[in-house]
Design a protein with these regions (language model features):
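Short, acidic, metal-binding catalytic loop of nucleotide-sugar glycosyltransferases
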Residues: 27-37
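Conserved donor NDP-sugar-binding/catalytic core segment of glycosyltransferases
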Residues: 103-142
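Non-catalytic, C-terminal membrane-associated alpha-helical segments of glycosyltransferases
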Residues: 228, 232-289
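A conserved acidic beta->alpha catalytic loop
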Residues: 27, 44-53
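A conserved hydrophobic helix/loop-capping motif in glycosyltransferases and polysaccharide synthases
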Residues: 8-24, 31, 43
Length: 289
């Protein structure tokens, strides 16, 4: 009698990044899947650059879920998670397409999840142009700094050697138990369509009693972030539109408040951090740094 394979659904939302998406899938094709039944679900949100055709041509086993261009990050991820749950996955590995993977990254995530019941496990994210430098790992809540803050000086050589607990995990590469999805649902795609949805989801899981861990031997190299122009460099009209009208913009004040309200250690800390954030924003707009 053979042991039952652990079913892992890999979920990746994509949009018009064919070259990067294909690079990520090529890297995934080389990982160790011993003892695992792995299926990849790509949610293509209406790409016009031939992404889906390229995937079908080179990776025919990948399941492609089409979108119409309105899904964005959260809804795209959700459609993939829902497909993985219908497939009856034991775990969902939600990730971005701009990733290159160590061949043991998934085995190490699974091993840590099995050793730590009721855990959500993130990979050690590293920059692909500075392969030793940690990227967006270990966020901590600091009320007097305006909310979540990411340590900037961590490297692959300075992080703990064993899995370590964190307050938040970004969605670049995170292993989520199917049990957690059944218990807590999926990302809040209505309020956080394209920014902060992963942070709010992790806060919800944590409040439900799931421990957030990072497995430091699960290496994933990511593309460095690109940022929009800072608010103080924009015209007054554009600033007002972003802050008060464009509720899909991550800098929208309503979204910023809701994020803190739902992910802070307490409601008082949420309000205080939001006020600090607004003060910092005002000072930057006035030319102070």
């Amino acid at each position: 009698m053979t042991d039952k394979l652990t079913k892992v659904g890999i979920v990746i939302p994509v949009y018009n990044r064919r070259k990067i998406t294909m690079q990520g899938l090529a890297s995934l094709a080389k990982i160790d899947t011993t003892g695992l039944d792995v299926r990849t679900f790509i949610v293509d949100d209406g790409s016009t650059d031939g992404t889906s055709d390229a995937i079908r041509g080179k990776f025919p086993d990948v399941e492609i879920i089409p979108g119409d261009g309105t899904l964005h990050y959260a809804a795209g991820t959700n459609r993939g998670i829902e497909a993985a749950m219908r497939w009856r996955a034991d775990f969902i590995a939600a990730m971005n397409d701009d990733s290159v993977f160590h061949d043991q990254f998934l085995q190490r995530l699974i091993g840590t999840a099995r050793s730590n019941p009721r855990s959500i496990v993130g990979s050690l994210l590293l920059l692909w142009d500075e392969p030793h430098r940690v990227f967006q790992v270990g966020q901590v809540w600091k009320t007097l700094k305006g909310g979540w803050e990411i340590p900037q000086d961590m490297t692959a050589f300075t992080v703990p050697r064993e899995a370590f607990e964190v307050e938040c995990i970004v969605g670049n590469c995170v292993l989520i138990s199917a049990e957690a999805v059944r218990e807590c649902g999926v990302l809040d795609e209505k309020r956080f369509p394209h920014g902060w949805g992963d942070a709010q989801y992790m806060a919800r899981l944590r409040k439900a009693g799931w421990t957030l861990l990072v497995e430091p031997r699960s290496y994933v190299w990511c593309e460095p972030n690109t940022y929009p122009p800072p608010l103080h460099s924009l015209s007054l009209k554009k600033r007002l539109n972003i802050l008060f009208r464009d509720d899909k913009n991550p800098l929208n004040l309503k979204r910023q408040f809701v994020l803190r309200w739902e992910s802070a250690p307490s409601k008082i800390a949420a309000v205080a951090a939001f006020l600090v954030y607004c003060v910092h924003l005002t000072l930057k707009a006035a030319g102070f740094r």
